[in-house]
């Protein structure tokens, strides 16, 4: 069970947090919106991969949908993306509207009816016979009667609109993104909600044996870890820390260990991880790796292709911002990349695999 639980979170859907460290130069290179989109896509991609594993016989077409057997049929049904597939292959029937489209249309119809003074949209079932009762005024007594004894009585308070436009579905393992600065992150680590007592645990302090503590007991260790965590923000050049909360706790421990989809340098090293309390620490991974792992670089290259390419090539050659990579592309490989002869290509490939720097 993850100990990082926010106060407003229901106990049925515990969160597993991941922090993405964005180096300062990447924060300058990409906007926060682009980084956020990158993270959303990568999280969705990982969730989708975990949810439906593709068998060996299943291939995927260009849109990413599954095809069984011998690939797509010669003539597929021409149905627009937002509608359900037709049983007859979309030949004669008009496309069925999705529930969302129907709701949207109803909403528009209601708005149009409201704008015209004193008119209401025509209902299919004819006029309503029963007049609707006025909303009952919520009093203390009625709230006691309606609510169970344990629940807090809300004195006629209007429910707040959801904070996010597309709120993630807890049952399907949706993802929320929060972009926070290091200071906010420090503040958030102090806000610990205790699920048993229902109280907030304060920031960890040293034990009372001396002014600096004994340095051995659990309280002192927690305090030292917290101090080191605060200092690590200065040593790593991060201007942004983006925290990803997955709404559904993963049953297996595949978040903690790099899988086949995540390369070696995916998670940040241990000294850059958030301090562990009772449960798992907040995992942090590198945004550079994330950009390489996910196909979002195509999207980013649309903005400025040469700049992004130059950045990645410079990185690959000098490996300054992504030093945990096992494979270093030598400068010779970059120099001989233009040659088309097969010997040169195989030579470059072998050099890249071995990772040796050879002077021309």
Swiss-Prot record:
Q: Where is the composition biased (Basic residues)?
A: 97-114
User: Highest taxon of the source?
Assistant: Viruses
Which parts of this chain are annotated as the region Disordered? 46-128, 151-175
Any additional notes?
This protein is encoded from a satellite RNA, called RNA3.
Q: Which family does it belong to?
A: Belongs to the nepovirus protein P3 family.
Which protein is depicted?
Protein P3
What is the species of this protein? Answer: Arabis mosaic virus large satellite RNA (Arabis mosaic virus satellite RNA)
């Amino acid at each position: 069970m993850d100990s990082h639980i926010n106060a407003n979170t229901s106990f049925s859907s515990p969160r597993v947090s991941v922090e993405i460290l964005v180096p300062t130069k990447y924060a300058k290179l990409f906007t926060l919106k682009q980084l956020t989109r990158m993270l959303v896509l990568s999280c969705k991609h990982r969730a989708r991969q975990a949810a439906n594993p593709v068998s060996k016989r299943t291939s995927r077409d260009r849109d990413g949908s599954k095809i069984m057997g011998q690939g797509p049929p010669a003539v597929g049904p021409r149905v627009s993306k937002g509608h359900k597939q037709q049983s007859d292959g979309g030949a004669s029937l008009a496309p069925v509207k999705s529930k969302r489209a129907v709701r949207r249309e109803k909403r528009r119809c209601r708005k149009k009816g409201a704008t015209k003074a004193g008119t209401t949209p025509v209902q299919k079932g004819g006029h309503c016979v029963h007049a609707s009762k006025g909303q009952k005024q919520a009093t203390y007594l009625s709230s006691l009667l309606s609510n169970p004894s344990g629940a807090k009585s809300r004195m006629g308070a209007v429910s707040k609109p959801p904070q996010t436009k597309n709120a993630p579905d807890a049952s399907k393992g949706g993802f929320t993104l929060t972009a926070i600065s290091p200071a906010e992150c420090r503040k958030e680590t102090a806000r610990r909600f205790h699920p048993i007592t229902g109280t907030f645990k304060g920031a960890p302090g040293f034990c009372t044996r001396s002014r600096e503590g004994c340095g051995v007991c659990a309280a002192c260790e927690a305090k030292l870890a917290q101090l080191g965590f605060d200092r690590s923000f200065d040593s790593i050049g991060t201007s942004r820390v983006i925290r990803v909360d997955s709404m559904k706790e993963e049953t297996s421990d595949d978040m903690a260990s790099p899988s086949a989809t995540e390369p070696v340098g995916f998670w940040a090293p241990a000294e850059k991880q958030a301090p562990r309390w009772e449960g798992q620490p907040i995992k942090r991974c590198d945004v550079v790796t994330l950009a390489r792992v996910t196909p979002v670089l195509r999207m980013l290259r649309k903005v400025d292709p040469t700049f992004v390419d130059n950045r990645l090539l410079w990185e690959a050659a000098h490996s300054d911002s992504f030093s945990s990579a096992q494979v270093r592309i030598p400068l010779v490989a970059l120099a001989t990349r233009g040659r088309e002869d097969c010997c040169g290509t195989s030579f470059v490939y072998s050099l890249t695999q071995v990772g040796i720097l050879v002077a021309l």
